[in-house]
Amino acid sequence: MACVSTCLILSPRLTQVGLSSKKPFLIRLRSPVDRYSFPRMLTERCLSTRRKFNRHGIAVVKAASLDKVSGAIKPGGLVESDKLPTDVRKRAMDAVDECGRRVTVGDVASRGGLKVTEAQTALQAIAADTDGFLEVSDEGDVLYVFPRDYRTKLAAKSLRIQIEPFLEKAKGAVDYLARVSFGTALIASIVIVYTSIIALLSSKSEDDNRQRRRGRSYDSGFNFYINPVDLLWYWDPNYYNRRRAREDEGKGMNFIESVFSFVFGDGDPNQGIEEERWQMIGQYITSRGGVVAADELAPYLDVPSSKSAMNDESYILPVLLRFDGQPELDEEGNILYCFPSLQRTASGSSRRKEYVGKWFDWVADMEKFFKEKKWQFSKTSTSERALVIGLGAVNLFGVIVLNTLLNEMSVRPGGFLTFVKNIYPLLQIYAGSFFTIPLIRWFSIKRKNNQIENRNKARLQFARALESPDIALRRKLLSARDMAQKTVIGKDRIVYSTDRDMMEQNYETDEWDRRFKELEKSD
């Protein structure tokens, strides 16, 4: 199996302690892939002489150059974190905080639900920008350690991070403006349509026109057309009182927003849930020692609903790709899945429960299965929806009547009526789409919810099977627990750190010999 080499270039302080004439300093590390192919791995350090050690296959990581650490992790002096996708950077930093700012790649991948490669790239970039440093354990594991104020340092360097809050606020303002504009357009359309209808009816008779103009100053009909927003009070006189009460409670939406909600909905209820799904899966695998059966992950994945396809474990392939997993056979021929990258952690806070029969008790601190939320047609209340539909119908009726009057008009319109005739196609599109779009959405939501319900039922079926496993499944789960390995890398196991001078670390040759002998005996 091929080895992957990683370069660590030490601090420039090392050149100040009289080591420039010495032979290259070597740290021998195994790649994440090779590390688990051999029973143990060794670390070799050479200062004035080279020490050769025995039969263990080892990949070489050279720290021969003592020029400067910035050459290794700060190429070009750029802000490396700006090259990361925003969600990857945020999830990686959240994972770093959760783990106490001392992490392995597996810690960040499992806590953040990131791909192993994404987690490694993010850690390298953030460490480069925040004066983070590396630690190497006695088994060759590389840990990333960040200062307490690393977020402040990163924000001070990155213009992108500084303007992100303003961009998010601007995006929210644009979204709210779009909602308000569409609702306001309904009121404006009603005002324009019915004002035009009145003007066209008035122009039919020169004699009645003057009388109707006088009449409009005194009767209530004119107020109805010129100010149709009064319909809000006619339909629901307590609307604004209820709206104010809901706003005080921190919930609900105003009428203008409810128009947009009725037509276009309120967005995907499962937005961001994929990230949560991968976080659940990563933390589950880590808590089980990095070895699981496919049946254990089925409650969190998109599994087949048919019983004939339940034996097909291809649904676990996305997990293997994301977390660098590989299938292994136990002594009984069961296929189990091992995730070496998630077996090494710098945090010993997560506890692992032994399997005692009840899977639901065993995962009491986690979600039992991944449940997707169903789509809602609209979050508006029944009364708000009725008001929106009523005003939409009033607008549609007015547009139809206006079309008839415009076609029957014998004289050439002028002024306001010319403007209305020019924008009439837009009024038609608005009035028609006001009901066409919700109708299409209703059928689409019904189909999506049926699919979501089927997926949730399939996951629940696997979860119930784990709650009361048969003998074969029980033996498979116990075998996975026997194969599980979890190594907590404490500070007592650190043999090298890039934040200290080499002479300060001053490991004696006898100490190294003792450690290697212990490793050989354990083999």
Swiss-Prot record:
It comes from the Eukaryota. It is found in: Plastid, Chloroplast membrane. It is a multi-pass membrane protein. GO terms for cellular component: chloroplast envelope; chloroplast membrane; plastid. The keyword Membrane applies. InterPro entries: At5g03900-like (IPR044200). The chain crosses the membrane at residues 180-200, 386-406, 423-443. Residues 1-63 form a transit peptide. Keywords: Chloroplast, Membrane, Plastid, Transit peptide, Transmembrane, Transmembrane helix. This is Uncharacterized protein At5g03900, chloroplastic. It comes from Arabidopsis thaliana.
